[in-house]
């Protein structure tokens, strides 16, 4: 059985972070659940960003503290995904984005990793004192909807996001 671990990113993963980022850029796939990684070529810059945001140090007013994890397959050290846990809400996050953002690298999709990473982050949500978390997905993302439902998501409605021109489905998961 594969051993998969949530880890906070650090510079020892620089090559893997670069590879992970590049795979998304090459595939034209959005890098969800990892903040500004798409815009940061230097992994050390991104790691510093994640540390600053977890501490809540010098973050923009329209942002909230968040904890960043990478999801690592221990057998080969490959980053399979990223997940970001937002400690609270801004008005935008409360309406559209939720507590959790995540993605699985394109070459590792459809293997159940998204379901597992969302499940594995729930104990950390509990440590933060979150009793329920809101997770959203674009209404056309069937795989993400299934991931959320498998983890106990309860549908709360669909909202139109005018800037991105998409409908977001909102779900709540009780943290046990």
Per-range role (PLM):
Residues 101-104, 110-123, 127, 146-150:
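Conserved acetyl-CoA-binding loop-helix of GNAT-fold acetyltransferases
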Residues 135-145:
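Conserved beta-strand-loop-alpha-helix junction that forms the acyl-donor binding cleft
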Residues 72, 86, 99-110, 138:
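A short, internal acetyl-CoA/4′-phosphopantetheine-binding micro-motif in the GNAT/acyltransferase core
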Residues 71, 122, 130, 158-161:
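Catalytic cores of nucleotide-sugar-dependent glycosyltransferases that transfer UDP/GDP/TDP-activated
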């Amino acid at each position: 059985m594969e051993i998969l671990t949530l880890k906070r990113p650090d510079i020892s993963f620089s090559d893997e972070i670069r590879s992970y980022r590049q795979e998304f850029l090459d595939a034209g796939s959005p890098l969800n659940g990892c903040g500004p990684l798409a815009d940061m070529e230097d992994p050390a810059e991104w790691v510093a960003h994640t540390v600053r945001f977890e501490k809540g140090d010098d973050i923009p007013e329209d942002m909230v503290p968040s904890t960043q994890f990478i999801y690592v397959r221990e057998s080969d050290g490959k980053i399979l995904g990223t997940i970001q846990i937002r400690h609270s809400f801004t008005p935008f996050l409360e309406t559209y984005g939720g507590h959790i953002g995540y993605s699985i690298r394109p070459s590792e999709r459809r293997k159940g990793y998204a379901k597992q990473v969302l499940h594995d982050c729930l104990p950390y949500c509990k440590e933060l004192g979150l009793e329920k978390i809101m997770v959203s997905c674009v209404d056309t993302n069937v795989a993400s909807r299934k991931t959320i439902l498998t983890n106990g998501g309860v549908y709360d409605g669909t909202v139109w996001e005018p800037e991105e021109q998409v409908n977001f489905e909102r779900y709540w998961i009780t943290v046990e």
